[in-house]
Amino acid sequence: MKNIKIYSLLACLCLLTQSCLFSEDDVFDDSSAQRAMASVDECHAALQSASNGWLMEYYPGDGPEFGGYNLIAKFGDDYVELASEMTTDNYAAGEVCTTLYKVVSFQGTELSFDSHNELIHMFCEPNGYNDPGYAGDYEFIFRSVSKEKIVLTGKKRGNTLVMTPLSADTDWKDFLNGINRIKDDAPYATYKLKIGGTEVVLSLIHISEPTRPISIS
């Protein structure tokens, strides 16, 4: 009889525990799936909010060895127009390439340039055996989103991609060609600057010329 009472008590405790589990309130007002979809919608809308596109400052590789590269992107609903300061096999600097993109929720909210295009995928493709090339990404995770700036990191290698909106009167080709003119007009690889009496070394990537001291008052 005593054993029957114990078993009955245990059965009641199990039923009460199960009831509590099913009646537990969600901490959030929305489900995780709803929150993920809301984040996708927010990021998708933000990408399309820049009327003349975004300046994309892209830093490929695992460190500073490649420096940064400038692209411009204008996002539509499912396509993006891209232009780059770089020249590829089929696109001159400043020439526009149109390709597909998508915003999805997987490991966070992601921007994926999954349709092959030279301007993005040139940073991701190896140059040959045991040569990772620029060691870049074509899938990026949103880290912060606003109308003034969007910051993303590469999904595989953690590359940094910073986007800021272009002014309405900016001509894409003139802007990117202007960047290339600055690089062409800088004939030295390393500059020694004196700022407030302190010597600072400024290095320019991919230019192999001797050092020249410059004094800035």
Annotate each predicted stretch with a short phrase.
Residues 92-94, 156-158, 197:
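Glycine-centered tight beta-turn/hairpin loop motif at sheet-sheet or coil-to-beta transitions
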Residues 197-204:
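Solenoidal tandem-repeat scaffolds enriched in leucines and small polar residues
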Residues 106, 113-116, 212:
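Nucleic-acid-binding small beta-barrel platforms of the OB/S1 family
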Residues 16-19:
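C-terminal motif of bacterial Sec signal peptides marking the signal peptidase cleavage site
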Residues 1-8:
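Bacterial N-terminal signal peptides that target proteins for export
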Residues 205-216:
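Single conserved hydrophobic/aromatic residue that forms the stacking wall/gate
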Residues 114-185:
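Beta-sheet ligand-binding and adhesion/scaffold domains
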Residues 21-110, 168-193:
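Acidic/polar, low-complexity intrinsically disordered N-terminal segments immediately downstream
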